[in-house]
Amino acid sequence: MKKICVLGGGAIGSCVSASLTDAGLDIILVDQWADHINKIRRDGLSVTTKEGEKNTKVSAYHMSDLAKLQPQFDFILMAVKAYDTQWMSKFASVYLKDKGVFVGLQNAYNDDLNADMVGRENVIGAVVELSCEIFNPGFVQRNTVPSGTWFAVGELSGEITPRLKEVQKIMLNVGKCDLTDNIYGAKWTKLIANSMTCPFSSLNLKNWEAVKLPGMFDFSVGVGRESFKVGKALGYMIEPLFGLTNEDIGNAGEDAAELVMKKMVKDVGPNARTHAAQDHIKGRRSEIEFINGRVSKEGRKLGISTPYNDAVVEIAKMTHSGKIDLDPSNINILFKKLEELIRD
């Protein structure tokens, strides 16, 4: 049986680990959060969905354990924040077999960075549609059940290979999983979706609450339209997400961002918070600079104005620095920042 390591025991990594363990695969979870690993070792990993709670005896290890055990893995599935990409993938490279496969189950655009650390020939890209949250050691809230969870996996070269099908087979234990010959386009499409929910991050609200605030839905659609425009200028072929088809996206035209936003808010359920909102609640750095910030950065290179994404980045900086507290009233600061950027 092939040996699998899930590197990163946050919400995504924990959900994936539980599902793969339940499927009977040879998998271990590795993380630097000592309390989480110790709790799992002692009491198992509890995953709660709308269908109930399930406790799974996941094999969990501290990162320091690997130095002693020196394991070699056929597959490493890395589920860490974008800002931890390079050092974590370098750490992982020591434990990946020569012809092993490294898959980044991450937001943002990290596959080329991962390739620099573990070798391009070892990397497969992935897109993740799985909403989940973790605030306490050993307990995960999974907002999308397996039937509503979706992955796409693709070779960086665009080829459909036997090893890609192996990764698909693994991920089918967690949710639906498609093969793509357009992983860069698929990754940008997910970045578009993430960019539209990042404006919620400083409001201390769940997604469905945030989107009901006056003007918030339209603001998020504005963010998405900019992200679509920049992606198109970069030459990325946009992929359908959230059960939408190419025909749905094509027929929507300029309203594609609005269509995606409506479908996304509907699918993730009433308890979901955007990943950036979870980070802010924990007092941690978010990935906004790697999502909306990436749109802004590429927009500047292309001469495309991105005031909506720029405003989201600026508000995130204010949150990170402690200049503003998490509160629904921050929507007014967000709108004011947008007005300033448009005037400039």
Segments (PLM) and residue ranges:
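Residues at the C-termini of beta-strands that transition into short coil/loop
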Residues: 31, 51, 64, 106, ...
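Rossmann-like NAD(P)(H) cofactor-binding subdomain of soluble oxidoreductases
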Residues: 54-141
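NAD(P)+-binding Rossmann beta1-loop-alpha1 motif at the extreme N-terminus of oxidoreductases
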Residues: 1-52
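Anion (oxyanion) recognition and catalysis
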Residues: 21, 41, 171-172, 232, ...
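Internal alpha-helical scaffold of NAD(P)-dependent oxidoreductase catalytic cores
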Residues: 94-95, 117-122, 137-244
